[in-house]
Structures are given as structure tokens and as C-alpha cells.
Amino acid sequence: MITVEKIGGTSMSAFQDVLANIMLRDPKQVNGRVYIVSAYAGVTNELLEHKKTGQPGIYAKFASGDDYAAALDALTARLKEINRGFVPLGLPLAVADGFIEKRMSELKEYLDSMRHVLASGYLKRESVLLAAREMLAAIGEAHSAFNSVEILKAKGHRALLLDLSGFDDDDPLTIDERIHKSFKGVDVQSQVVVVTGYTKGIEGIMREFDRGYSEVTFSKVAVEIRPGEAIIHKEFHLSSADPGIVGAGNTVIVGRTNYDVADQLADVGMEAIHPKAAKPMELAGVPLRLKNTFEPDHPGTLITKDYVGEMARIEVIAGSDKVTLVEIHDPNMVGTVGFDLQILEIFKRYGISYILKATNANSITHVIWEKSVTPAFVEELENAYELVTTRPCAMVCVIGSNMAIPGVLARATQVLADSGINVNCVSQSFRQVSMQFVIERPEYKKAVAALNLALCLGGKKAA
């Protein structure tokens, strides 16, 4: 069976475990596998910005006109230090260092040229900065993919690098066209194929998907070659709740679910898979498996299109404490056709997508990511409507593929009430795949722990 497999950055940094637990675990199943690899942990954060904290990286230095050359040199030194750590695995150091030195030198030349173009004023600044961001993003995956192939070759395996970053390719191809062209004539069955998580395309993968680009490459490759299974290897299982909140011993591995549930998780920021990556695989009928790199014997969680649990159960408690409630109250709303359309036109102008929406006769409440709430956005709403309320909050969700049974909503609400947690807003669609509760931000972790204990663990907490 041919598989397409994505390996995340944290796992890539522990490449000895990737070799032992994934790539070379079964000597009879080394070939016929396509790996889409992320950059080593932290590298893309240094190139762009920290994914979670927003701390600026080299991109910000370039965009602001600061000295990015010194930062590039420092990163080159760090990448070579990473190389040295893989020498015991067979990485030929001189070859690996030569590759990254050349690639970083080329990157600096491109950025220098872009700096001159920016100074000329002939091109839109935004277009040049987007191109720079694309080039910076491409470096990390090219580095890790190149090293992976060299290590596999050193161990006597047939390995092929498909560098989709297009650094030395000026063909004006779309992302799909580049993937199709790169795989044309490739015999996947007889070798290991390692693919960069970044793909160059005229539409710009960063512009379209930002930091979710490696999963989008993974998805598009899976749709291109139609494997028996697509697999994502992470440093954790898809579990009933965040182990960092409830404790590793107080979770249940999901095991089986469907793409609808995966969409719900992605919508609230839980990193199962990027929503724009999941949809093409769902439509193509490609089953997706999520596995823990460090527990190779566990089958993980299989996601398919039509799966519905045989027994009614809650599969995941998810959510976020980094959201904001935006409520619009206006008496003119009553009976007015298309009133909410006017609101969403403002949302669209600011590029804002909501996570939850609830309405009554004269109020509409949206929950959005707090980073989307800018003074200009709020001011435009206040100028258009009678009363606008913004409030930092948290949202906790009860999610499952088979929850359409009487009493689930009541039970979840009672669990929150028993924990002294007030529900400020609630939403559930007819499909009953996700129940969303808006609560006060300081109550978030307590809510997750309480719901997980009562609904997923049956009230039995680990000692």
C-alpha cells in the first residue's frame, strides 16, 4: 500500500525516532512511502515569526528595513549546528552544510534585490513583501527534506528528494501544476520519496494558507497520487482533551472519527489538520490517520468521510481562551430582511471569519479570534449600530460524530453549572456535531477539565 505521510517539525527534530518508529520500522515497508516534511522545530518561527507568540523573525527585519543580513548569518550557523547533530545518523556534514550555505546565500541575494526594488517605488510594497515571505518560508522545509534524503541514502536506501520550493525553477506554475509535474514519471513504489512541505506556486501558498502550508502540500500530494492512506505524524495523539490542561493520564485517544469532526476541531484552532487541507482529501475519498511519532505501535486515530460512532459518545472537548465576543444590539433588527448581511459585509472588509453566531430578536452575537479585534473594526461597527459590546471570553466545545441523542446538551450545561461556570452564550447546529459554550476566560481550563472528566472519562479521573 502506498502512503502519503506528513511529519511535523517537533518530530523532525527527533529524527532518530522518525527513522526508528516510522521510516525504517518495518524493513518490508520502507519503499512506497511519500513523506512531506516540515522544517525542524523553531526554524520557521525564526524565518517568519513565532507561530503562537507572534515574536518577529527575519521577515519582520526585512519588512521594516532593519539589518536582516546578520539574522540570516545567525540562522545559517544554527542550521549547520542542527546538521552536526545528525552526523551520528549518517548525514554527510560537508554535503549538508554546502547545501544550506548555498541556499541561504541565494536567499540573501534575492532579498537584497527585493530591497532595491522596494526602494525604487515602482512596485507595490505588499506584493514584494509577500514574495519575500514565500522565499523565507521555503528554506526550512528544503533543509529538513535534503537532510532526510541524505541520511536515508547513507543507510543504503533508495531515496528521492522532490524540492517543491522552486528556488532554481522559474516556470510560472500553480501549486497543483508544480506537484503534478514533480510527480510525473516518479516510481513511488520502488523508493522513498521525501517532499518539501513548502510548494512554490504563482498564487502563493503563504498568501492563501499562511502557516498551514505544509498540511496543504500534504493534502494536494495525497489527492495527486491517491494513496491507500494519508498519515500525519505528530508528537501527540488526537485525544479527548488537551493533555496540557487535564493531564496525560486523563485523556482518551479518539481512535475513529470523521472529517466533519476534524472541521470542527480546526475551526477552534485545535491542530488536527488545517481545514483547507482536509476538504480535498475528504472529497477524494482519502482516509486520514493521525499517529503519535513516539508511540509507533498505536494505530492512532482514523478519519474517514462517513464514519459515525456505533455508540453515542463525546469524542473531544476543545476550544480556546483567545477569543472575543462581539454583540450587536439594534432595535431596527426586528423583522428586517438581510440585517445580518450588512454586519458580515463589515466582517468581510476586515478579513474576519467568525467561530460562533447566535441571534435573538434584536441582537446578534459573534465569537471571533481576539487578534481580529482592531480599533478600526470596532469603530466601524459602533458607527453603524446602536450598541456594540466587545468582551474577551473563552469558548469550550463538546464534539462528536454521534451525539444526536436526548440529554447531551442538558448534561453538558449541568456539568458546567456544577463547576460554578456560567454559560454566557450557546450554539448548536441541526447536525449536532458540536455544542459551543461561551464562558468567562478565567474559567476555560476548569471547564475543559470538568467536561472531559464527566463526558469522556465517565467521571473516572486517573489517580
Describe each model-derived feature in a short phrase.
Residues M1-I273, A278, V438-E440, G459-A463:
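Nucleotide/pyrophosphate-binding catalytic subdomain
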Residues H157, P227-G228, V286, I352, ...:
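Short glycine/serine/threonine/alanine-rich loop segments
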Residues G166, F236-H237, E295, A361, ...:
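Conserved beta-strand edge residues that scaffold enzyme active sites
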Residues Q189-S190, A284, Y350:
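Structured helix-beta-strand junction loops
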Residues E229-H233, L288-L290, I355:
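Short hydrophobic alpha-helical runs that function as membrane-insertion/retention elements
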Residues N258-N332:
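A conserved active-site cap/scaffold subdomain adjacent to cofactor or substrate pockets
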Residues P299-A463:
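A conserved regulatory-domain signal marking ACT and ACT-like small-molecule sensing domains
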